[in-house]
């Protein structure tokens, strides 16, 4: 008999390496990390087909242009390499080791870490991913200054251009073009390294690599960044689609969200869709603990705003996503204000005065 309710385990990819090899146990123990800026904004293509057109994205004063090479824009699957690199570097930082932008590693260890196969085609796909990561140029005003200066957008604008990976080296056995890959070395960009040094990273669930569809990965990233360890987070469907960077109709995306709600297989969060308001609600499963959230111990992260405050914020900043503004406000303030609700509304009013409608 076929069960009426799909098994979430069947919806996820199989765990290809449930018992990691002995020689990579130190790698498997590294906590899975991702960069906050790339989780919140669509830096990566969601299609496996090469995308060679320049793409521009703008949201709440932040903007970025993604300029691909002739081999196509780096994809969300190529990003696995950077997630691995960030995880390894953060692991070393937490162990008190010195780190820099260069990382040498075994591609086999990486493939196991990201739940890939370890056949010949998987190694060749790894090399192709390096080429796309090196070829993709990011132009953006989303800064990761190493000095940590809290300059609100609107007062100054700092535009950066960088490659996701600045250089890469692959060593093959016997030096042959089709020889077995022995090791690889990459140098990440200063922009990414600054995020690591400032610990602008979040822990991801290991089942992230078991999500089958690129859009599911992207929705999880947004939920992880915006909801964090909060009980819930609500976002409009149209706004969520924009933030994913997906090239699909709102009708198609609505179907995607309904499937996520129906099958309930997203790691860390359940998904609820409000038909009346066309809103998506992420509900924490309680698997994300506050110690995993950057700056979670700060009072600014545990402030609770009144429900009426969001209505007043919408009036203060017409057209803006007040939930996104709330996150920006929390990141900007350094201590809990005496009147959080009034302070947040004032922040929204200033944003509207400086930036106008989005």
Task: Please identify what each model-predicted range represents.
Residues 317:
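Short, surface-exposed alpha-helical recognition segments that flank or form part
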Residues 1-313, 327, 331-358:
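Charged, alpha-helix-forming regions
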Residues 320:
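Electrostatic, structured charged patches in enzyme active sites and in nucleic-acid/phosphate-binding
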């Amino acid at each position: 008999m076929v069960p009426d309710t799909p098994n979430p385990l069947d919806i996820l990819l199989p765990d290809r390496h449930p018992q990691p090899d002995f020689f990579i146990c130190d790698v498997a123990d590294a906590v899975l990390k991702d960069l906050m800026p790339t989780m919140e904004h669509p830096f990566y293509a969601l299609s496996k087909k090469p995308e060679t057109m320049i793409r521009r994205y703008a949201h709440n004063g932040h903007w970025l242009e993604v300029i691909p090479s002739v081999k196509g824009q780096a994809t969300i699957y190529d990003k696995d390499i950077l997630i691995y690199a960030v995880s390894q570097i953060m692991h070393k930082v937490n162990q008190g080791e010195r780190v820099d932008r260069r990382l040498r590693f075994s591609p086999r260890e990486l493939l196991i870490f990201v739940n890939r196969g370890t056949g010949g085609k998987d190694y060749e796909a790894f090399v192709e991913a390096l080429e796309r990561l090196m070829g993709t140029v990011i132009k953006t005003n989303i800064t990761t200054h190493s000095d940590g200066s809290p300059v609100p957008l609107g007062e100054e604008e700092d535009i950066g251009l960088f490659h996701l990976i600045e250089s890469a080296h692959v060593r093959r056995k016997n030096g042959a073009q089709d020889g077995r890959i022995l090791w690889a070395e990459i140098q990440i960009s200063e922009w990414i390294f600054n995020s690591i040094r400032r610990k602008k990273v979040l822990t991801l669930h290991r089942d992230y690599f078991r999500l089958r569809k690129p859009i599911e990965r992207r929705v999880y990233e947004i939920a992880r960044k915006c909801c964090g360890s909060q009980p819930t987070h609500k976002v409009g469907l149209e706004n969520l689609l924009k933030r994913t960077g997906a090239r699909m109709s709102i009708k198609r995306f609505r179907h995607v969200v309904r499937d996520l709600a129906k099958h309930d297989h997203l790691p860390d969060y359940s998904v609820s869709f409000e038909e009346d308001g066309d809103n998506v609600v992420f509900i924490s499963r309680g698997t994300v603990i506050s110690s995993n959230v950057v700056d979670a111990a700060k009072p600014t992260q545990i402030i609770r705003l009144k429900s009426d405050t969001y209505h007043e914020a919408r009036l203060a900043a017409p057209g803006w996503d007040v939930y996104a503004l709330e996150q920006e406000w929390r990141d900007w303030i350094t201590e809990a204000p005496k009147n959080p609700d009034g302070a947040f509304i004032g922040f929204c009013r200033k944003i509207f005065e400086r930036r106008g409608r989005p």
